[in-house]
Design a protein with these regions (language model features):
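A domain-start/cap signature at the N-terminus of enzymes
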Residues: 17-54, 90, 151-158, 166
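Active-site glycine-rich loops that stabilize anionic/oxyanionic intermediates
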Residues: 60-63
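Residue in the alpha/beta-hydrolase core beta-strand immediately N-terminal to the catalytic nucleophile
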Residues: 147-149
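Conserved small/polar residues in nucleotide/adenosyl-binding loops
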Residues: 167-173
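Sec-dependent N-terminal signal peptides
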Residues: 4-13
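Active-site machinery of serine-nucleophile hydrolases
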Residues: 65-125
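Conserved acidic catalytic loop of the alpha/beta-hydrolase fold
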Residues: 129-145
Length: 174
């Protein structure tokens, strides 16, 4: 039984490491000095003159931190899957929400029902930094500004919900 446990630990570690290996690792610093660790993958075989969609993936609360690795725990391997990469070539950004922060809202809403969500809140510094990161990639000529996808799970889904309410977050500045 002990051997199986050890095998499972090594197997889960190897899956986690393989999810990290295909991603570029970087830290974005905003114009106000706020930093946001993120991972990114590019389309495997980019063709000159072709534009590719951009996918922004927002992770859940359990992956917050500053190690620039935990945000790949759920979903990281899916974007690296060779079949998916060939069939759906895209730029994929996977930022990491800092520990103690919440995607998009200035503070976590007390109710998670859409009708009770706070409306008209000012963007948090994290959201502004995320917007600047997004704008950096939207300025690239290879990115199709008409195909921007924001997806998330759990806390990231709430960030997605909030992000699309800020039209200026999902629309390029230029």
């Amino acid at each position: 039984m002990k051997q199986w446990s050890i095998l499972l630990v090594f197997l889960s570690l190897s899956l986690s490491l393989s999810a990290q290996q295909g991603y570029e690792k970087d830290v974005f610093v905003s114009s106000t000095g706020d930093s946001l660790p993120y991972r990114m993958i590019r389309p495997e075989s980019m063709k000159a003159g072709k534009k590719y969609p951009l996918v922004l993936f927002l992770h859940g609360a359990g992956e917050r931190g500053n190690d620039n690795e935990r945000q790949l725990t759920h979903g990281g391997q899916m974007f690296l899957n060779p079949v998916n990469r060939e069939k759906y070539p895209a730029f994929v950004l996977v930022p990491q929400c800092p520990a103690g922060s919440y995607w998009a809202y200035t503070e976590r809403p007390k109710s998670l029902f859409p009708a009770d969500m706070p409306a008209g809140q000012e963007m948090s510094s994290l959201t502004r930094t995320l917007k600047q990161l997004l704008d950096t990639y939207l300025a690239m000529p290879e990115v199709d500004k008409k195909r921007i996808y924001i997806v998330g799970l759990s806390m990231g889904a709430m960030g997605t919900y909030d992000s699309v309410s800020y039209t200026h977050l999902t629309l390029p500045t230029t």
